From Swiss-Prot:
Protein's job: Catalyzes the phosphorylation of the hydroxyl group of 4-methyl-5-beta-hydroxyethylthiazole (THZ).
BP terms from Gene Ontology: thiamine biosynthetic process; thiamine diphosphate biosynthetic process
Enzyme Commission numbers on file: 2.7.1.50
Family that this chain belongs to: Belongs to the Thz kinase family.
Keyword match Metal-binding: yes
Class of the enzyme per the UniProt entry, highest EC level: transferase
Swiss-Prot/TrEMBL keywords: ATP-binding, Kinase, Magnesium, Metal-binding, Nucleotide-binding, Thiamine biosynthesis, Transferase
Pathway in which the depicted protein is active: Cofactor biosynthesis; thiamine diphosphate biosynthesis; 4-methyl-5-(2-phosphoethyl)-thiazole from 5-(2-hydroxyethyl)-4-methylthiazole: step 1/1
Residues annotated to bind substrate: M50, G195
Listed name of the protein: Hydroxyethylthiazole kinase
InterPro entries recorded: Hyethyz_kinase, Ribokinase-like
Binding residue positions for ATP: R122, T168
Alphabetized Pfam families for the sequence: HK (PF02110)
Length: 259
């Protein structure tokens, strides 16, 4: 199994495209991470919108550059709104199947959504393996599997759905079912702040709206988040000071490619 690495030039090119196109991302995400997700997108140069009412969601999904479906705080009314948005979306959409391996209702819902052909799927190893039908597991939103162990499941899921599948962990793996790109970096402190994975899913959604190689663009999203995490940790004393430094680091990365 060959795992390629993303070059700095590829990442910088994707970030230049990101700034140039400034995607409008319709984030149907969970209640815990909305502010952090919106600020992450803004720091990189995208425009977030959090529209959740069923009638409005289906209307707005057709306007946005990209759509994110994150099932972290799923309810039946929210599931109806998400389904309506996916059905009306004429743009790329990304699925974040939070805790899909641990809870039956959201697993059934996410499997139903797969028939609408997501452009990308982003999850930890346990979530991707569960969604692929390989195993059930995970401790709530936390993974109990190493990212590398989920590569075969990610490849299968990508081939079956046509999506770019992202498995996040100490090393992130991005695959279209054939090619695999590995992204190293980041820091364990990133796992001590709620929402870094969910925010990444929003950035992945935005990258799916960019022109060019979608796999490379999505892999670049992982690279930016890991880079920003490393920079933020170097300036932080713990999780509380990490968040503002992380947002600053994303902003600085975006400014650097414009210089």
């Amino acid at each position: 199994m060959q795992v390629d690495l993303l070059s700095s030039a590829q990442s910088a090119h994707a970030l230049h495209l990101f700034h140039q196109h400034s995607p409008l991302v319709h984030c149907m995400t969970n209640d815990v991470v909305q502010t952090f997700t919106a600020n992450t997108l803004l720091a990189l140069g995208a425009s977030p919108a959090m529209v959740i009412e069923t009638e409005e969601a289906s209307q707005f999904a057709a306007i946005a550059s990209a759509l994110l479906i994150n099932v972290g705080t799923l309810t039946q009314p929210r599931a109806q709104a998400m389904s309506a948005a996916v059905e009306q979306a004429q743009t790329p959409w990304t699925l974040d199947p939070v805790a899909v391996g641990a809870l039956d209702y959201r697993r059934r819902f996410c499997v139903e959504l797969l028939s609408h052909k997501p452009t990308a799927i982003r999850g930890n190893a346990s979530e991707i393996m569960a969604l692929a039908g390989v195993a059930n597991g995970g401790r709530g939103v936390d993974t109990t599997d190493a990212a590398a162990n989920a590569i075969p499941a990610a490849q299968t899921l990508a081939r079956e759905t046509g999506a770019i599948v992202v498995v996040t962990g100490e090393v992130d793996y991005v695959t279209d079912g054939h090619r695999i790109v590995g992204i190293h970096g980041g820091d364990p402190l990133m796992t001590k702040v709620v929402g870094t994975g969910c925010a990444l899913s929003a950035v992945v959604a935005a990258c799916c709206a960019l022109p060019g190689d979608t796999l490379e663009n999505v892999a670049s999203a992982c690279h930016w988040m890991k880079q920003a995490g490393e920079r933020a940790v170097a300036r932080s004393e713990g999780p509380g000071s990490f968040v503002p430094h992380f947002l600053d680091a994303l902003w600085q990365l975006a400014q650097e490619v414009q210089a």
